[in-house]
Amino acid sequence: MSTITTSSVASSNGMRKNGKNWHDSKKPFRPTSGLTSYEKRLEARKLQEAVKEHEREMREEREAERKAQIQKIKDRRAAKEEKERYEKMAEKMHRKRVERLKRREKRNKLLHS
């Protein structure tokens, strides 16, 4: 009977690939595996995600401010160009005609936008 039990124990482990069954089977070397509990890891992960979310919000806010500033500059430049264009037109033609063209262009701009 003793031979049956020893063979069943040996067969449960299986044969080693190199055939040295007299050596103990090695276990993986994980020195830090049991140091922190699962709850602590979950808590740290939640904290990290909250920090990342806050950073993402701050980044988006900064980007929105930047885009608003860029749009403001573009609008200012467009207004300046339009003003210069009307001044050039005023040099060439009468003041009343320039005002009439301004009104017409504003109407068209409102219709198309």
UniProtKB/Swiss-Prot annotation:
Record's compositionally biased regions (Basic and acidic residues): 38-92
Main location (coarse class): nucleus
Key word rRNA processing present: yes
A single BP term in Gene Ontology: rRNA processing
Region of interest: Disordered: 1-113
Composition skew (Polar residues), residue ranges: 1-15
Ranges in a coiled coil: 37-100
Pfam families to which the protein is assigned, alphabetical: Cgr1
Annotated Basic residues bias: 93-113
Signal peptide per UniProt: none
Summary of the function given for this chain in its UniProt record: Involved in nucleolar integrity and required for processing of the pre-rRNA for the 60S ribosome subunit.
Protein name, as recorded: rRNA-processing protein cgrA
